[in-house]
């Protein structure tokens, strides 16, 4: 019998059917090869949007710079970056008028944070441009390298451990006539292998000292390295994203802290909150507009899209905003906050790896590094690349392109949101002074605009006014991509609103399944994801139960741990059957040891080990939770771990799951091949750094609220902490006199060794 699919939806409200429209199965596209072309696109496009600005030359670096601020007012609908300073300042003033004291209070909050933040804040984050090696590194390593080089160049403020003191060093470093850095290089030589008697290439890593003059150092300090954004769905073309170096990061962090504090106080801001909190905040704005429009007014909503938000923003505008926001604050605070936008006005974009050429006939491949693009003969390139290079050439210095206008992706999300909200704020009747008025939501470059008016003409006039007001501050609403509807149905940051936000459960589908970390973590993450979706995404009990059964099935196939009494034959079945037969209480076996599944939708919050603990045979308990088990390299496990799961759309999400350490919490060993490459030195540095940080955390666990303050080095801090703790333990009788004496002796020895060094 044929089933008419429409019948499935007879009882379902239309908005619940959104989960059936899910287009994203399979893997998202990843980029391969070089991002140089995408970066050149970004640089060229950004300059095109601001082409009527004024050209100047940076006196320190010699970089040509384009300044579109207060440029010509737009005469057409083309996107442009000609923001008018006075308009931006006026929008800020009105924002403050509608929210009395907002800037003042946010400044006070930020000032407190600035004085307390420690430099290790900069170790958060993933890949960071490491200016010492001129390539990307993990954030912690890049910071360590920067501090090491600052120290060897006589800059020592950072040793106090406060971020603000590190930033003082950054400022001083820019005044120095030269900086001496240590870089890594590879030597390759052909040697005969004693065992196989074949010729092999041996690589050795050298470190060499190099002096950078002021100009070269400044260029590196102002450089953003670029990469291609991966895993973007729904786009044919890839695009470039940027990662700044350590000199810029600290300043950006403080600006974003201030902007975050302002956004928290603005009802139209979709940042910095997320999830249900965000939905509640946004639903309030919609409710307000709908209540007011009940009988007399029409209300329409635009699901908005802005053209190239980042490329039309301008750091000089951000400087104007910060100058206004902090106008009554102490001089030092205003200076610290204005440095980030100033650095961005002088930024350089690194063009990435360059181009790869291959000759089919001679089987040769050669890399043309970005540094060579300035003077290589263009006949080797195809038409489109040739155009790009010709356009970008006047901007090139040492393989980086001068990029003064525009704001590379993801840098000032909070501050640009403040700018967007300030325009939404102008929609109040007391500002429009007419019959139409507007309000809306803003989250970075995404917006939704709600316009109310007595008739259609009024709605049209309101939209036009909003559009033009945006133009004045460098925001370009795309008329092609924005969509208007009766209020009650719109989309904002992938939330779909139809008389309330609709749970689009299918967006979470890719995060169901086995993560592939290890047996213990995967089980925990799997049930946590199902639990979270029951709480947040209208995942009903029947569907959740089914999801759970599918997950267990998936898990058993992944780890080949089918029940001990199953007929399925795998590599592990012989061992698991043996375990099953010799276990008295079979219900106590973990699923990964061939046990039954005891999970149902009521107990998803309990880790499996805890769920089954009372049911386990004693010797099984002993084997399972044995820290001395020689086959497991144990990482110390906090009570809660974080896993990264990928929803279909939007950024990777961090999911907290309960981590119970068992012999199933193994960590795969690092691939050996890295140890023979140039990365080896870096890997050792990183492990060293990790060990130090772990040791430090032992002395100052995150739970202890007081961080060491005003002590000059980590070692001294740890020694003094050890002495205090030992004294407390001795006086309360927790340790014996001999132990106390031994601890004191070790502390003195450490101090003595430091003095000799």
From Swiss-Prot:
Q: Which residues form the RdRp catalytic domain?
A: 286-483
Q: What is its EC number?
A: 2.7.7.48
Give the GO molecular function terms.
nucleotide binding; RNA binding; RNA-directed RNA polymerase activity
PROSITE patterns in UniProt: RDRP_SSRNA_NEG_SEG
Q: Where is the composition biased (Polar residues)?
A: 55-64
Catalysed reactions, semicolon-separated: RNA(n) + a ribonucleoside 5'-triphosphate = RNA(n+1) + diphosphate
UniProt keywords (A-Z) are:
Eukaryotic host gene expression shutoff by virus, Eukaryotic host transcription shutoff by virus, Host cytoplasm, Host gene expression shutoff by virus, Host nucleus, Host-virus interaction, Inhibition of host RNA polymerase II by virus, Nucleotide-binding, Nucleotidyltransferase, Phosphoprotein, RNA-directed RNA polymerase, Transferase, Viral RNA replication, Viral transcription
The record's annotation in Pfam families points to:
Flu_PB1
The alphabetized list of GO BP terms reads: DNA-templated transcription; symbiont-mediated suppression of host gene expression; symbiont-mediated suppression of host mRNA transcription via inhibition of RNA polymerase II activity; viral RNA genome replication; viral transcription
Give its localization.
Host nucleus; Host cytoplasm
Q: Where is this region: Promoter-binding site?
A: 249-256
PTM characteristics: Phosphorylated by host PRKCA.
Q: Where is this motif: Nuclear localization signal?
A: 187-195, 203-216
What's this protein's family per the entry? Belongs to the influenza viruses polymerase PB1 family.
Instruction: Please describe what this protein does.
Output: RNA-dependent RNA polymerase which is responsible for replication and transcription of virus RNA segments. The transcription of viral mRNAs occurs by a unique mechanism called cap-snatching. 5' methylated caps of cellular mRNAs are cleaved after 10-13 nucleotides by PA. In turn, these short capped RNAs are used as primers by PB1 for transcription of viral mRNAs. During virus replication, PB1 initiates RNA synthesis and copy vRNA into complementary RNA (cRNA) which in turn serves as a template for the production of more vRNAs.
According to the record's subunit comment, the protein's assembly and interactions are: Influenza RNA polymerase is composed of three subunits: PB1, PB2 and PA. Interacts (via N-terminus) with PA (via C-terminus). Interacts (via C-terminus) with PB2 (via N-terminus); this interaction is essential for transcription initiation.
| Protein name as annotated | RNA-directed RNA polymerase catalytic subunit
Originating organism: Influenza A virus (strain A/Silky Chicken/Hong Kong/SF189/2001 H5N1 genotype A)
